[in-house]
Amino acid sequence: MKRLEDNKKWFTFSNISTIVMTVFVLILFFRPEVKGLVIQRLMKVGLFQPDVPEISEASSVPVQQAPNQQVLFTDQKGNTINLSDQKGKVIFMNFWATWCPPCIAEMPSIDKLYAKYKNNKNVMFIMVDVDGKMEASLAFMKKKNLSLPVYISAGAIPKEYFSGSMPTTVILDKFGNLAFHHLGGADYGNPEVTAFIDKLAK
């Protein structure tokens, strides 16, 4: 009888909720996809918005000059591109990894943004897998039903673009200057991002 009473005391709302929260935290810790999904839900309620510079017809977009060095990437077909050869194009460049929860969370919004510009010869997307594992990245894109173009680094990346934090997103103007730099996950479905790219692409 005493044992039954002890069991009833143990099965309190407080104890059960503590167990549920502990399990949830452990799942978030060990399953980056679940954590990514949680962040994605928060994006839908207006959190994790990118800090896009204000644009007006009367003022130019503030920019930072491009680093004076070659920046090379290899695409999924094995072709190497030089960033300096892409002058005349607005470059949306994202540094990510398949195991990074904020990267996973923001990918669908970047994919939708890419869909708007994939046929625009003046805008280019470069999704850089920082681990340099092309096959794993392509498998990730296929599994998530994403059509983003994957690249890996073929040389040193200037710290002005990427200093180790993931995800990192930069947007370069048509002259190769740094017009936007954001650390951490963000919702790139925000109309301000589209307006910003459109302004740069004019």
Feature annotation, model-predicted:
Residues 87, 95-112:
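Conserved redox-active cysteine motifs that mediate thiol-disulfide chemistry
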Residues 105-144, 152-160:
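Structural microenvironment flanking redox-active thiols in thiol-disulfide oxidoreductases
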Residues 89-91, 95-99, 165, 175:
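Short pre-active-site segment immediately N-terminal to redox-active cysteine/selenocysteine motifs
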Residues 33-70, 139:
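N-proximal helix/coil linker or "cap" segments that precede and/or mark the start of modular domains
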Residues 1-11:
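N-terminal Lys/Arg-rich, disordered targeting/topogenic segments
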Residues 65, 70-91, 117:
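A short beta-strand-turn-helix
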Residues 139-146, 152-199:
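Thiol/disulfide oxidoreductase modules built on the thioredoxin-like
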Residues 15-31:
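Hydrophobic membrane-insertion alpha-helices, especially the h-region
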